[in-house]
Amino acid sequence: MFHVSFRYIFGIPPLILVLLPVASSDCDISGKDGGAYQNVLMVNIDDLDNMINFDSNCLNNEPNFFKKHSCDDNKEASFLNRASRKLRQFLKMNISDDFKLHLSTVSQGTLTLLNCTSKGKGRKPPSLSEAQPTKNLEENKSSKEQKKQNDLCFLKILLQKIKTCWNKILRGIKEH
C-alpha cells in the first residue's frame, strides 16, 4: 500500500527506478589505428551490404531501435555494443551460410574490438519481430515475405549506422 500511495502522492514512479540504468557498459576500444576495422570489419560490412538486395525506399523508415540507440558523442561504444548484439539475432534467420559467416564476423569482430565489460543483469534479447496470427496460407506467405523484407531493411540500416559510427570513432582518434 505504501508503494501505491507514494506513486500517487508524488505523481511519479519511485526515483530509484528512474535513476538506475538497465545495463551500462564500460568499453575500451582496441585497435585504435583502424587496421582491424579497415581490413576485416569494413570488408565484411561491404560484402553484407552487397548481399542485401532490395529497393532503397525502406531506408526512409527509421525503426525504434535507432530512436532509442544512437551513435551520439561519447555514446559510440555503447551504440556499437548494442548494434553488434542486435546483429547476433539475425543469425537465427533462414539465411545462407556465407551471409551468416559475414554477419558473425562483423558482430564478433566489433565486440572484440570494443572489449566491453557489462555491468548489469543479462537480458534475453527481444525477438526480431512478434509472431502474427495466420488467417490463411496465402496471407501467411505474404506476411512472412514482408517480415523478411522489413528485417533486411533494418539490417541494411543497422550496417550503415555501424559503419558510420566506426568512421566517427576513427576520425575522432586521428584528430586527437
Swiss-Prot record:
Protein localization: Secreted
SMART domains associated with the record: IL7
Pfam families: IL7 (PF01415)
GO annotation, cellular component aspect: extracellular space
Assigned keywords, A-Z: Cytokine, Disulfide bond, Glycoprotein, Growth factor, Secreted, Signal
GO molecular function, one term: growth factor activity
Any one Gene Ontology BP term: interleukin-7-mediated signaling pathway
Glycosylation sites: N94, N115, N140
Disordered: annotated segments: 118-143
Signal peptide: 1-25
Paired cysteines (S-S): C27-C165, C58-C153, C71-C116
Source taxon at top rank: Eukaryota
Keyword Cell division: no
Stored InterPro entries: IL-7, IL-7/IL-9_CS, IL7_sf
Keyword Glycoprotein: yes
Assembly information from the UniProt record: Interacts with IL7R and CSF2RG.
Protein family according to the UniProt entry: Belongs to the IL-7/IL-9 family.
Function, in words: Hematopoietic cytokine that plays an essential role in the development, expansion, and survival of naive and memory T-cells and B-cells thereby regulating the number of mature lymphocytes and maintaining lymphoid homeostasis. Mechanistically, exerts its biological effects through a receptor composed of IL7RA subunit and the cytokine receptor common subunit gamma/CSF2RG.
Protein's UniProt name: Interleukin-7
Native species: Bos taurus (Bovine)
